[in-house]
Amino acid sequence: MPMEVFSLTSTAIPSTLTRRDTAADKPSPHLNLSKYSHFMRYPLTTTLTNNRIRSSSSSSSSIRAQASGSTKSSTAEGIPEKTDSKDDNLVFVAGATGKVGSRTVRELIKLGFKVRAGVRNAQKAGALVQSVKQLKLDGASGGGEAVEKLEIVECDLEKADQIGSALGNASTVICAIGASEKEIFDITGPCRIDYRATKNLVDAATVAKVNHFILVTSLGTNKFGLPAAILNLFWGVLIWKRKAEEALLASGIPYTIVRPGGMERPTDAYKETHNVTLSTEDTLFGGQVSNLQVAELMAIMAKNPDLSYCKIVEVIAETTAPLTPAEKLLTRIPSQRPYIPSPKKVQKADTATVSNTGPSANVVAEVPSIAPQKETASKPVAKTEQPLSPYTAYDDLKPPSSPSPTKPSEKKQINISDAVPTPISSDTPSSIQEIDGISQTTSSSKGKESLSPYAAYPDLKPPSSPSPSVPTTSLSKRDTVVVSSNGPAQLSVEDTPKNEEQHLHEPKSRPLSPYAMYEDLKPPASPSPSFRKS
């Protein structure tokens, strides 16, 4: 009986609720929210709510109450929160039927991306579809048919209202459009295609809040330099490309601007003999690179947005350049803004770190082991100055010692005492001392010893240079020349008188002419002029 009373009470409709909803024409504010904004975000949940409303057989006031209650419960419990609707694996390529665009589509599919190819006429995309069908994907690219990853989208970039729907939920946009070479006589081509159409795509990507925008322009767009500046003869194409770059820079979305060299003559086999080199902005004004090399570079940029984030890259290919991966080349180019990852990548990184850490018990158990390390790290460690010499690190290693100069008197004292017998004089007393069986002779008074080596050897005499003789024609009979080995030549004047001796010591005047020394030598006589005989 109590259970039945409870059942009857629970199924009854409160009078207050009926009175509050007497105005049937005024809809509930919560129902209006679920009808519009909630339906746009979560159509499945709103459909279930409407089915519950239709299946109810109660009065109109009770229906509104039940619908309001069911909507609240489904929103709180069954609807996940919306974080980011962009597909990180989807890329929109503008100009997909061009030389660079078609190769970019194939390279993106090889890396596992899904591609929305934007073309003005879908009938002209048959060659692109056939080339994609010929691709063979490996396991790293996701496998399956390559054409399943391609979606052709008709879109005229000169009409801004068509671009938003063509982008879809692509997270990356690659713009590879440009004025056609076939329409070289079209004066408005660079302005319409290279600037206005590109600006429309940039504006649509800004509204869609894409994660990455890659734009292909050309060398010499910002700074004048030959031979790149010659392209401005074709209706100022570099000027319009620069205005497109400025529109992308002002949009605020993450960007990468690729400025390739000449791509008209190089074929796809160009990469076999020429390697790609990357330079910073306004560095190169000439060079060539193939369309395939530029397409491969942009596909790698889309795969690694952190390496190409907010960078302006100039690309050419050279035979002398080393073969370097594009990822390593991109790291050498400085970024103009710090890299900010997308919310999806941040959420994935957080979940990956949480899954790798394990249960909370292990974390608590590891805390005590971490604490002592922090304490030891906080203590200041006194740094000891290490000597610069390597000899302090090894005990047995000694620096090479240069021989110290010794006084010449020490060695000469021993040699002289051994070789030349010194006369024994009573004036110089000597004392003999024996120390440990060795007799040493020390003289009380040491005289000055000669530094000349000739004193050590009695037979060794210094060379004597001949002294010049007095320029006299002949000497007197009583004068004899005595040549001593130890000194200069001397004249012996034993029998000469004193006046002659004084006369010999006086210097005599020497004639300046050499002819006085030789009797037979006469100076040459110049011929004297003779008179003519009549």
From Swiss-Prot:
Keywords for this protein: Chloroplast, Membrane, Plastid, Plastid inner membrane, Protein transport, Repeat, Transit peptide, Transport
Comp. bias intervals (Low complexity): 421-432
Primary localization class, coarse: plastid
Pfam families linked to this entry: NAD_binding_10 (PF13460)
Region (3 X 22 AA approximate repeats): 387-532
Biased composition (Basic and acidic residues): 495-509
Localisation: Plastid, Chloroplast inner membrane; Plastid, Chloroplast stroma
One GO cellular component term noted in the UniProt record for this chain: chloroplast inner membrane
Sequence repeats by residue range: 387-408, 450-471, 511-532
UniProt miscellaneous comment: Dissociates from the Tic complex after addition of NADPH, while addition of NADP(+) reduces the interaction with PETH/FNR.
Protein's name in the database: Protein TIC 62, chloroplastic
Native source organism of the sequence: Pisum sativum
